[in-house]
């Protein structure tokens, strides 16, 4: 698992009780299952097949539990992962969980960028970032897909199977209140009643900046930089 910070907001939002697990028996107890990012998608996918977690996730999906994937988790949710250049290992084709009609092709070029987007059909402006290897496309070429995120430049990210199952390359997607409200929908919780994590982070940055100003001679640093 990588990018633990994707889930910090869930630890602070009172609507959710977050727990991490690699045990199959714990998966079925959850109302929402999130497959996180990883630096070794294929190896970790093989690991969850071996320990029974993959089967438990598929069973939860069939029981209409909410299942979402972020980055590597999104790749796992597809039909298969192809690695013709053996970027991640010797295996060139690995079966995915089959929850989303997608195919991922691993590449040795890494995508790294910040993104502004709109989630589903909501009007709220959202922010996140991408850091991944590989491209993910519909299983059948030319197939119309239901886009999850529409980026500011008009490009798209992610796939939405229905209200309860989607995947995205977007890290930080849960930091956006509209996404958390959507995630909590159906559980009898009022929208907008959660924790504003983005505002919380800004306050923490301001506090940190204040401490740095107290401890560091910024005027001297600026003078040496000719600012």
Show the residue positions of the predicted features:
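Catalytic cores of nucleotide-enabled group-transfer and carboxylate-activating enzymes in metabolic
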Residues: 1-3, 7-14, 19-32, 57-64
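Active-site-proximal beta-strand elements of phosphoester/diester hydrolases
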Residues: 36, 128-132, 166-170
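Interdomain boundary/hinge elements
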Residues: 26-27, 98, 109-111, 193-198
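Short, glycine-/Ser/Thr-/acidic-enriched flexible segments
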Residues: 1, 25-26, 39-41, 74-75, ...
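Cysteine-nucleophile active-site neighborhood
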Residues: 38-127
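Glycine-rich, charged/polar anion/phosphate-binding loops
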Residues: 20-21, 81-84, 111-119, 146, ...
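Acyltransferase
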Residues: 1-5, 11, 156-227
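Catalytic beta-strand/loop cores that center a nucleophilic Ser/Cys/Thr
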Residues: 119-163
């Amino acid at each position: 698992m990588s990018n633990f910070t994707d889930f910090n907001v869930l630890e602070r939002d009172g609507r959710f009780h977050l727990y991490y697990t690699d045990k199959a028996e714990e998966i079925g107890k959850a109302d929402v299952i999130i497959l996180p990012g990883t630096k070794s998608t294929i190896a970790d996918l093989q690991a969850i097949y071996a320990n029974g977690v993959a089967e438990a996730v598929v069973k939860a999906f069939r029981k209409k539990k909410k299942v979402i994937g972020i980055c590597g988790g999104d790749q796992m949710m597809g039909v298969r992962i192809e690695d013709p250049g053996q970027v991640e290992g010797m295996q060139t084709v690995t079966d995915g969980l089959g929850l989303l009609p997608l195919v991922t092709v691993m590449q040795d070029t890494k995508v790294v960028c910040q993104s502004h987007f709109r989630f589903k059909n909501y009007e709220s402006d959202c922010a996140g970032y991408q850091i991944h290897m590989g491209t993910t496309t519909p299983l059948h070429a030319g197939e119309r897909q239901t886009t999850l995120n529409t980026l500011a430049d008009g490009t798209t990210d992610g796939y939405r199977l229905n209200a309860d199952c989607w995947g995205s390359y977007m890290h930080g997607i849960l930091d956006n209140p509209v996404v958390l409200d959507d995630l909590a929908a159906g559980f009898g919780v009022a929208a907008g009643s959660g924790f504003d994590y983005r505002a919380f982070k800004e306050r923490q940055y301001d506090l940190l900046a204040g401490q740095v100003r107290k401890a560091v001679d910024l005027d001297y640093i600026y003078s040496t930089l000719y600012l």
